[in-house]
Amino acid sequence: MAQLVDEIVFQSGVKLHNRIVMAPMTIQSAFFDGGVTQEMINYYAARSGGAGAIIVESAFVENYGRAFPGALGIDTDSKIAGLTKLADAIKAKGSKAILQIYHAGRMANPEFNGGHQPISASPVAALRDNAETPLEMTKEQIEEMIERFGDAVNRAILAGFDGVEIHGANTYLIQQFFSPHSNRRNDKWGGNIERRTSFPLAVLAKTKQVAEQHNKSDFIIGYRFSPEEIEQPGIRFDDTMFLLDKLATHGLDYFHFSMGSWLRNSIVTPEDQEPLIDKYRKLQSESVAKVPVIGVGGIAQRKDAENALEQGYDMVSVGKGYLVEPTWANKALNDETCAEFADIAQQEALQIPTPLWEIMDYMIVDSAAEALKHQRIKELQNVPIKFNSGEYTAYGRGHNGDLPVTVTFSEDKILDIVVDSSKESDGIANPAFERIPQQILDGQTLNIDVISGATVSSQAVLDGVSNAVDLAGGNSEALRCKAKEAVAWSSKTIEETVDIVVVGGGGAGLSATLTALDKGKSVVLLEKFPAIGGNTVRTGGWVNAAEPKWQGDFPALPGEKETLMLLAKTAESEFSGEYLEDFKVLKAQLDGYFTDLENGKQYLFDSVELHRIQTYLGGKRTDLNGESIYGQYDLVETLTSRSMESIDWLSEKGIDFDRSVVEIPVGALWRRAHKPKRPKGVEFIDKLSKRIQEQNGRIITDTRATDLMVDNGKVVGIKAVQADGTELILHVNHGVVLASGGFGANTQMIKKYNTYWKEIADDIKTTNSPALVGDGIEIGEKAGAELVGMGFVQLMPVGDPKSGALLTGLIVPPENFVFVNKQGKRFVDECGSRDVLSEAFFDNGGLIYMIADENIRQTAANTSDETIEREIKEGIIIQADTLEELAEKIGVPTQELTNTIAQYNACVDAGQDPEFHKSAFGLKVEKAPFYATPRQPSVHHTMGGLKIDTKARVIGKDGEVIQGLYAAGEVTGGIHAGNRLGGNALIDIFTYGRIAGESASDLV
């Protein structure tokens, strides 16, 4: 039997000074892009020296292949410098540095990968709640992935690592290709066990090839494997031994078990108590026997390690022990007792990065609990499906309360599902109500993926059916564990020619499509999500446009005159170029208005020039690098001059605007918003999409645009892929319009470009649709488009602290906003711009409270009495009969809050705010009951994007127009500059959406 202190020499000739390696424990502490942090270097340096080798945790080989946040990357050459520092820190004390390389495959959560749908051998989701169904990799993608692994090995060598460990375990991509559960292919990469070994073998071959190219005969190559899978069908131990024999034949330095205990027995047949290492030694081939094998799991003290070697392992891998005992190897070899727990005050001393420290409890796996979990899954998969026949109604939790679901059962089958969605929001939820029931019926399983963009509604349907199953005497837990069928995958390619293709089904895309249809063009609109709507359907519906004749019928509010007087006093040096001429025109207009006020004419003023100047000043910002930005004049001039054109066009298309009130959205600076009578943005989506259908326009959902087709600098078409893998190749006679939105749901992309905010938290919430991940910007940039303003991102100050959503709680007009901090004090002009408000929120702790009374509650247009009552019960809104009681409930000083409200009410009476200069006042806070809505900034709008001209033509990096390519909406930059006014987003999408449709139709 080998001893812990014995050296070991690998086939490559590399020698380790003992039989201990530090296991590749994920510490989740890399930069947002996967770069090495100093915390990581310190962590590994503190643990090196004693062990023969340190295996550094999973490094993703492709940008969208992360399995967890804070993952380490080796996907680009830019990572080499940081990895070099890491390797040097490990090797400086005598340990060999080995880097584990992997791709998560279907385990790549879109949340950690910019919203990108995961990939795998086949479109089969993992057996876990809400698992995303992956895209099946094409043959070309498989070859590219093998090259990516080779590139990763090359970078590891350049960074100075002594070897790599190929991560073929933990249900990640390499294991997925070997697994009969996740690999249902019938080509050279799958179909039988022999072909399922092809991908792991190809990765090994590529690894060896790269090492040979560097003349690195002494480069360590290891392979980590999970011996079994619980899934049906899944990897069994005999299968694993077949794979290991193939790998060993090609030459390896070691195999590395991946399991929670070195003494673990089978998870497939737990009644068989024989340890897997014993089975391994009995079944090993001659080739496998020559490769050292590492045992892992449950090795806390020297005795554990020695027992593992005695059981048959050649080496031991220590994970959790090294977390709390950085010198574990030295202590174990000196027969000292190793710590098994860390004191709460030891984080700094142990050099444990904060992300790891915060999740260490969750990283310590309870082996007994894991065994029970596996046994439970196995039992549930064998439970017979039986019901008490009949019709049962149960409920799930939807957006607006309980969602009734009526399910009809036979004795062994779900026969029918009827969802009563009458109280749910239109548009965005519809696919969930149609698709989820059908998928349940087709598969007779509750193991169903939620619909992208309709997560809450999807879960409500699933929960409703689950509850109905239990009412009918069935076992909903068993149905949730029942394997889902593989997606019927298509290798079909559809090729056709149309006049125009529009990418994105939000307001900009629908406007462009309808405009082109009006001009007699054939148009196809592609939407990657199951439902159209994008961010537009999530808005409050406010559309800015200066309409002085209409606005002049409304009285001026207290504070508005003061706002205009301050604006008129702005130094002319603040204005650049043609904006100065507009400012001079505006000052003359204001002189006339002030005269009218003196003569008793108390009306609301507005003009196109005021809208333009406020858009300019509202967007004029300087970033952290001292770079200033403001809206490109001709783009802003076009937007503000043609805004009423857009309002009239929308009215013509059936939008019924409420002319009884003129409103000011959050951060709008002025009352000029037009709003439909039907609440929220769904009115625009509903009416415009119906017009498109009436004119035989084609809207294709579940279809993701991937690449523009460019010929001699001109865009001549676009490629896309549908949810079932069908490829679309669409040639265009006129052009392609990109209207796919910004990247507000892609935190990594925001952090990559950010130059404005001091910090963007990894867990910051967003008001955006999860579809908005910047793919349209990436597609355009690949075709040569110039990007502008990418460093600026707008935060919505009044986001929901839990979800990031905008339209929860009491969202009232800003003239009725009253913000207080945790000291119960006001701290800002509540009518200020969004970035100013967000910064003020951060300066006051991030979370603040919006205070309202019963009268102000009645002005909330985002909600209903029923929703308010529900949100009070849930704690989204806090209600009290007195201000004193409200202060107690939200934890602010009672006297401060009552004084603050008294002072605010005095400002309303006086029509001016000496301390914060609030620009408009509405109602006082005086009628019980009183309300507080907690709010916190969330990502709302990304300011940068593709550069366009006033014809919505995309501009290339050479400054020239890219023929055949147009863009509109948040996918573009240059209009709003550093900050967008509330209400300007919708007028932007409808104005430039129409312009894009016009230009593409007319071949401008």
UniProtKB/Swiss-Prot annotation:
Q: Which reaction does it catalyse?
A: acrylate + NADH + H(+) = propanoate + NAD(+)
According to the record, what induces this protein's expression? Is maximally expressed under anaerobic conditions in the presence of acrylate. Under aerobic conditions, is highly induced by acrylate.
Q: Which free-text remark accompanies the cofactor?
A: Binds 1 FAD per subunit.
> Which keywords annotate this record?
FAD, Flavoprotein, FMN, Oxidoreductase, Phosphoprotein
Q: Which Pfam families match?
A: FAD_binding_2, FMN_bind, Oxidored_FMN
Field pH dependence: Optimum pH is 6.5-7.0.
- Which molecular-function annotation in GO is an example for this chain? oxidoreductase activity
Known post-translational modifications?
A: Is flavinylated on Thr-455 by ApbE, encoded in a neighboring gene. Flavinylation is essential for catalytic activity.
Cofactor(s) the record lists = FAD; FMN
The UniProt record gives the binding positions of FAD as 508, 527, 535-536, 540-541, 775, 941, 970, 985-986
Per the Swiss-Prot or TrEMBL record, the active site comprises 834
Top-rank lineage group of the source organism: Bacteria
InterPro entries, per database record: Aldolase_TIM, FAD-dep_OxRdtase_2_FAD-bd, FAD-oxidoreductase_2, FAD/NAD-bd_sf, Flavocytochrome_c, FMN-bd, OxRdtase_FMN_N, Succ_DH/fumarate_Rdtase_cat_sf
Q: Which GO terms describe its cellular component?
A: membrane
* Family statement drawn from the similarity comment of this UniProt entry: Belongs to the FAD-dependent oxidoreductase 2 family. FRD/SDH subfamily.
Please give the function described in this protein's UniProt entry.
Catalyzes the NADH-dependent reduction of acrylate to propanoate. The principal role of ARD in Vibrio seems to be the energy-saving detoxification of acrylate coming from the environment. May also use acrylate as the terminal electron acceptor for NADH regeneration at oxygen deficiency. NADPH cannot replace NADH as the electron donor. Is also able to reduce methacrylate in vitro, but with a much lower efficiency.
Protein name as annotated: NADH:acrylate oxidoreductase
Taxonomic source organism: Vibrio harveyi (Beneckea harveyi)
